[in-house]
UniProtKB/Swiss-Prot annotation:
SUPFAM superfamilies (alphabetical): Amidase signature (AS) enzymes
Keywords: ATP-binding, Ligase, Nucleotide-binding, Protein biosynthesis
Organism: Maricaulis maris (strain MCS10)
GO biological process: translation
Name the record gives this protein: Glutamyl-tRNA(Gln) amidotransferase subunit A
Domain of life where this protein originates: Bacteria
Function, in words: Allows the formation of correctly charged Gln-tRNA(Gln) through the transamidation of misacylated Glu-tRNA(Gln) in organisms which lack glutaminyl-tRNA synthetase. The reaction takes place in the presence of glutamine and ATP through an activated gamma-phospho-Glu-tRNA(Gln).
Family: Belongs to the amidase family. GatA subfamily.
Gene Ontology CC, one term: glutamyl-tRNA(Gln) amidotransferase complex
Length: 491
């Protein structure tokens, strides 16, 4: 393993600007590392070495002229949900297998404008539907961290490939999407930092849609500062996305390391759920103690509609998915399975193209939107969503940020929950509220459990206040002193 790839994004960009290392050298090494790790981690879905080296060469030319963007020359991994021009973008689904977009997603375009270098596409749960990266058409991704007895663990989902790539030091940052926790839960499971900004802060244009009102593109990184750097490079108004915010992007990096003294931190009683492992509760209490020691005021708060968040989410998200995924019929792009007539072709194509979990969610979504059940399910879920947002708005009149666990457990063994959808869905219990309310949230490594596996803490802040999120995240990072790394078994 190269020592260079153990560096942070901030450190490597400084070395690139100082001409201590070349972007081409980094890109070449990154490709070799990823290809060597692929047979064991199974984290990647596509490479384009020519594209990678051409982008790296262009970065070197800019740096030689004393130019360059925020992350000039840094190799990045891209979740297989974002269109990268000329590179297969399949959302880890058979129905899009072989699809190579002729356009660039807005998020990746911004990363390239800021100097990022495309390294690879990363595996994910099919169409971002899953919490363990086991529904991918290329098979499960293995977490770089192993269980106490050496068993393979999930990296979380749906952005498990990106989380695994960052945790294994195979790239300097990665993109993910977070619809109900798909950045924050994998970050917690892999000991990385994962960020979901305010809804609309990062553009959804060119990213395959799951649930349009809940989808949040965001970054994975090794440190809070790196995540701020990545989000800075990804954010900004996009006229192609009607939900994109027109607001100026603050200096997220400048917020990292600022004092948290005097900030009021809310601790919601509703997040102390039944059956939560003692280690999760202990990590949460440590986070509270760290922030208190840093000069924060700890305030007990109530978010009374939290108990309805998970069922509301699993009505709203499948409903939007059933609508979004109606466009995949094999007619103009992707795989087509011919039938004896048009309807048979549609049925064959969608039946063969979509995996079981995607089919399950499409059926749930179609059911809750049907004439006899719309009011009973979908409409009520939207009312709950409004109540959840109101709970947060009332809480933020008293506090500046909310602190909770990121996930109800450490990473679990692959296959241990794949036959129990309810147990799988419960992984999102701490994260879905921020999606339903459209609020910024991040997961920061806060320690390890008895088996040495990472645990994460979640910070939620008011809309458009990512700066406070980064301040609090950096304070936890400093206090936790998390430096644990998985033993390298994949090289």
């Amino acid at each position: 393993m190269s020592e260079l790839f153990k560096l942070t994004l901030s450190d490597i960009t400084a070395k690139l600007k100082a001409r201590e290392v070349s972007a081409v050298e980094l890109a070449t090494e990154g490709l070799a590392l990823c290809e060597a790790a692929q047979p064991k981690l199974n984290a990647f879905t596509a490479f384009d070495a020519d594209k990678t080296l051409a982008m790296a060469k262009a970065s070197d030319e800019k740096l030689a002229r004393g130019e360059g963007g925020l992350i000039e020359g840094a190799p990045l991994a891209i979740k297989d949900l974002f269109a990268v021009e000329g590179v297969e973008t399949a959302a880890s689904s058979n129905i899009l297998k072989g699809f190579k977009p002729t356009y660039e997603s807005s998020v990746t375009a911004k990363l390239w404008e800021n100097g990022g270098v495309f390294l690879c596409k990363t595996s994910m749960d099919e169409f971002a539907m899953g919490s363990s990266n086991e529904t991918s058409n290329t098979g499960p991704v293995n977490n770089p961290w192993k269980g106490a007895n050496g068993e393979m663990l999930t990296p979380g989902g749906s952005s498990g490939g990106s989380a695994a790539a960052v945790a294994a030091d195979l790239c300097f940052g990665a993109t993910g999407t977070d619809t109900g926790g798909s950045i924050r839960q994998p970050a917690a499971f892999t000991g990385t930092v994962g960020v979901k900004a305010t809804y609309g802060r990062t553009s959804r244009w060119g990213a395959v849609a799951f649930a349009s009102s809940l989808d949040h593109p965001g970054p994975f990184a090794k440190t809070v500062k790196d995540s701020a750097l990545m989000l800075q490079a990804m954010s900004g108004h996009d006229p192609k996305d009607s939900t994109s915010l027109p607001n100026d992007v603050p200096d997220f990096v400048a917020a990292v390391g600022q004092s948290v003294k005097g900030l009021r931190i809310g601790v919601p009683k509703e997040y102390r759920v039944d059956g939560m492992p003692a280690e999760i509760d202990e990590a949460w209490q440590k986070g509270i103690d760290w922030l208190k020691a840093a000069g924060c005021e700890i305030v007990d708060i109530s978010l009374p509609h939290t108990k309805y968040a998970l069922p509301a989410y699993y009505i709203v998200a499948p409903a939007e998915a059933s609508s979004n995924l109606a466009r995949y019929d094999g007619m103009r792009y992707g795989n087509r399975v011919e039938g004896t007539n048009l309807n048979a072709t549609y049925e064959n194509t969608r039946g063969a193209g979509f995996g079981h979990e995607v089919q399950r969610r499409i059926m749930i979504g179609t059911y809750v939107l049907s004439a006899g059940y719309y009011d009973a399910y979908y409409l009520r879920a939207q009312k709950v969503r409004t109540r959840i947002l109101q709970d947060f708005e009332q809480a933020f009149e008293k506090v500046d940020a909310v602190l909770t666990p990121s996930a109800p457990s450490a990473a679990f063994a692959l296959g241990s929950k794949s036959d129990d959808p309810i147990a799988m869905y419960l992984n999102d219990v701490f994260t879905v509220t921020a999606n339903l309310a459209g609020l910024p949230a991040m997961s920061v490594p806060a320690g390890v459990d008895k088996d040495g596996l990472p645990l994460g803490l979640q910070i939620i802040t008011p809309a458009l206040d990512e700066e406070t999120m980064f301040k609090v995240g950096a304070a936890i990072e400093d206090s936790a002193g998390f430096v644990a790394k998985p033993e390298n078994w994949w090289a």
